[in-house]
């Protein structure tokens, strides 16, 4: 095998910015910061973000009311 051909692997602490969860991975990068991890992502937890869904409902109701006023 050739020397200095393969990248160096590091043990990296990955930090979730949302829930502050930390876990360790092996990578060629020295640092990771992620927005959402499996501990706080809605797909994995089964929880929906109420604020986001409420905002979408309000937006739909405003468009519907605007359409009714035009008639």
From Swiss-Prot:
Transmembrane helix among keywords: no
Cross-referenced SUPFAM superfamilies: L28p-like
GO cellular component terms, semicolon-separated: ribonucleoprotein complex; ribosome
GO biological process: translation
Gene3D superfamilies for the chain: Ribosomal protein L31
Subunit structure: Part of the 50S ribosomal subunit.
Family affiliation: Belongs to the bacterial ribosomal protein bL31 family. Type A subfamily.
Functional description taken from the UniProt entry: Binds the 23S rRNA.
Name of the protein: Large ribosomal subunit protein bL31
């Amino acid at each position: 095998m050739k020397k200095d051909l393969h990248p160096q692997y590091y043990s990296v602490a990955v930090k979730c910015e949302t829930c502050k969860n930390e876990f360790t991975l092996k990578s060629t990068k020295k640092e990771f910061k992620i927005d959402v991890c499996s501990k706080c992502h809605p797909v994995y937890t089964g929880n929906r973000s109420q604020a986001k869904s409420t905002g979408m409902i309000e937006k739909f109701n405003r468009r519907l009311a605007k359409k009714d006023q035009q008639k």
